[in-house]
């Protein structure tokens, strides 16, 4: 990374966890990601979900077609399939052969937005997981239990004990990405796990703790899943992200929702951060005194874990304050982005 006091130039990053939606909403938000990132792992939780390789290929075409002309050829969507109780080993073989599917996403049924079709019992997926292990197809995990008896702030910690640890014992060769980790326990799990286990960390979980949900009143635009945690957990995530450990890397989990779905009696979970994602990460690393480790976290660790080449082009950020918009277009509606109306310290050059 080449940097001065007022400019950072480094290898173009990738986003290893992104929600793009579809149709006009996708056309609205896709440029924010494509300007900053060369590639992104695209989440499959559409309505209906992306459960076959054929559907993933069609979705990929829609994404590429939605890129504005000035960004054409600059962004590559990396596709995923939504794991269900009925996903077959044959579908995993097709996914691997396609060259476009980079992972299979495990959503415990009901764990987050559009997860109703998710896995009800991981034991039902044994043959499929065996095929994934055989073909070295990564399993991307939303790591929360959905047991109503478990406190919402403990869902990730309990998932490690009840689901993830037994899963890795049963499938010792399975490659797993523990997505959007939020707890000290998850950090420690990855640090002590074999090299086949990695984790993504979001910008919002690095910047916010659970107080942000209630500052001056209820803050629905800070509601996400996994939910924000205590400050001790944010500090653990910050230390992990800036440590240089090769199995922690960037995944924004940027998730656009219209204002009406957030400001609701039963609001949706999700934070939109794609409008300033790499700028937010730079700010976090600068505050931690670890700007020298930003490039590895954002641009090297992810492709290295997935077995993909690192990007060869570069981006620059300049130290310039700019105001984040109060609202962003989302198709025919509006969304409120992370830190709406506030000022960011770094700006995309």
From Swiss-Prot:
It holds the Pfam family Amidohydro_1. Zn(2+) 1 binds at residues 17, 19, 105, 253. The active site is at residue 253. Its cofactor is Zn(2+). Pathway: Pyrimidine metabolism; UMP biosynthesis via de novo pathway; (S)-dihydroorotate from bicarbonate: step 3/3. Substrate binds at residues 19-21, 45, 142, 225, 257, 269. Zn(2+) 2 binds at residues 105, 142, 180. Binds 2 Zn(2+) ions per subunit. NCBIfam families: pyrC_dimer (TIGR00856). This is Dihydroorotase. It comes from Nitrosomonas europaea (strain ATCC 19718 / CIP 103999 / KCTC 2705 / NBRC 14298).
